[in-house]
Amino acid sequence: MRDALDRLEFLSDYREDNRIEAKRAQGGLPHSLWETYSAFANTLGGVILLGVAEGEDKSLYSVPLFDPQELADEFWSMVNDPKVVSVNLLRREDVQIVTSGRNQIVAIFVPRADFRHRPVYLGEDPFTGTYYRRGEGDCRCPRHEVEAMLRDRADPNPLAGLEPASR
């Protein structure tokens, strides 16, 4: 996914999918960014592109951002707030300001969360704040899936210590 940074000048070659999400972000960080962060972390990971819009043909294109660095700083402040999101999975290099065409965009690389951190959820309630990625959309996780993630987190190896049955 990171090698995509080298090709962001060809942004129109990309489409939103289960690993790429475009956000205009011209009015600041959109609330839906956090749903996508949760969804990517709980699924396969992906990249969120701030300052990018989707055309009628579904191709992506950059739009001017007032202050990309301010957006990145605001993101860092919020991703470290447990009232916003349950865990920060990112390293400094996972948030980059890159040039695409004549505009700068903010690329946020969200890794898939390790089972010990899942579910990654918004707010304080995993049952209402956990999302997963389906195609190009973020969907709220059903209760039974959240329960399964919590169970896996508590007991990552439920078969440890068991002996094979004798024949």
Task: Please provide the spans of the model-predicted regions.
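Conserved N-terminal catalytic/coupling substructures associated with nucleotide/phosphate chemistry
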Residues: 1-167
